[in-house]
Swiss-Prot record:
Organism: Human immunodeficiency virus type 2 subtype A (isolate BEN)
Name of this protein: Protein Tat
Keyword Transmembrane: no
Anything else known: This isolate is from a German AIDS patient (with predominantly neurological complications) who was probably infected in Mali.
GO cellular component terms listed in the entry, alphabetical order: host cell nucleolus
Amino acid sequence: METPLKAPESSLKPYNEPSSCTSERDVTAQELAKQGEELLAQLHRPLEPCTNKCYCKRCSFHCQLCFSKKGLGISYERKGRRRRTPRKTKTPSPSAPDKSISTRTGDSQPTKEQKKTSEATVVTTCGLGQ
């Protein structure tokens, strides 16, 4: 009778133990996750003021703030509103109350002479009814 050959137990690894390949993958995945978090932290960091005042192409792409201000021309600063000079109220001159309302505002209604001339032109234009 022959006895079957048994493999030494030390050479067989149970399935649930992590292999060296998976542990290296886990380490690289963790490093990539850390790098991604750092990049996101840098991206969401508030913009710092830049004192560069040159508008050349190189300086316009210097940082995100320079690009938004110089490259795109966007500025989120409050613009100062112009203050109007107060209007001077004019006091009516003494001759103003003597004038009638129509002469101050302009003649909006035709006078009697203008009415007569407009009626005469209407009669002449009607004519025989061609």
